């Protein structure tokens, strides 16, 4: 018969293992996350759906997915969102698989997160949990405009400058061409009038012809008289 001390010694390791297992248990939480500001739409498949979340129980959690960093806050959804677990079930021996969805949970909250930029903490700055929170909204660059999109505005100004000046130059050229064309037309009119009207001012061609004709008639008359 075993002594009580031996039995206690045999039981103690089991209790220790159970305590270790209880300490190693982790609570599993499901969070519905809505991301915005993503450039590459396939980055979730590239990172194999792995991410790191900091401060999930706080008002403003921060999440890192691959090289992207997102920050956001919890919001109410328009309706009830249901989360399923996707699985594969083989239908027949030939290898045809069927996608099966298994209900996991439902929620009426979502974590709306926007891509943000982190800055290195400098000496003398106040401690903000090691992370700087950026208040940014969609299409709103009023906060830190020079850092985020200054180069974009410079290129837009350079591209818009020649484009805006070009119509003005064309209008100037067209006005100059019209002015020169009007001047040439006026010069042609003046030259044409000078060629058609070589006589002195005040005398018409009909008067000149009549005077010449009368002169020849007078000459003939004088010659006849002499003869």
Swiss-Prot record:
The alphabetized list of GO BP terms reads: transcription by RNA polymerase III
Check the record and name the InterPro entries matching this protein: GTF3C6-like, TFIIIC_triple_barrel
Q: Does the keyword Transcription apply?
A: yes
Q: Which Pfam families match?
A: TFIIIC_sub6
Q: Which residues form a coiled coil?
A: none
GO: which molecular function terms?
Answer: DNA binding
Disulfide bonding pattern of the chain: none
**Region Disordered: start and end of each range?**
157-227
Q: Which GO terms describe its cellular component?
A: nucleus
Q: Basic and acidic residues bias located where?
A: 186-195
**Function (record text):** Involved in RNA polymerase III-mediated transcription. Integral, tightly associated component of the DNA-binding TFIIIC2 subcomplex that directly binds tRNA and virus-associated RNA promoters.
Sequence similarity:
Belongs to the TFIIIC subunit 6 family.
Name of this protein: General transcription factor 3C polypeptide 6
> Where does this protein come from, organism-wise?
Mus musculus (Mouse)
**Name of the gene this protein is made from:** Gtf3c6
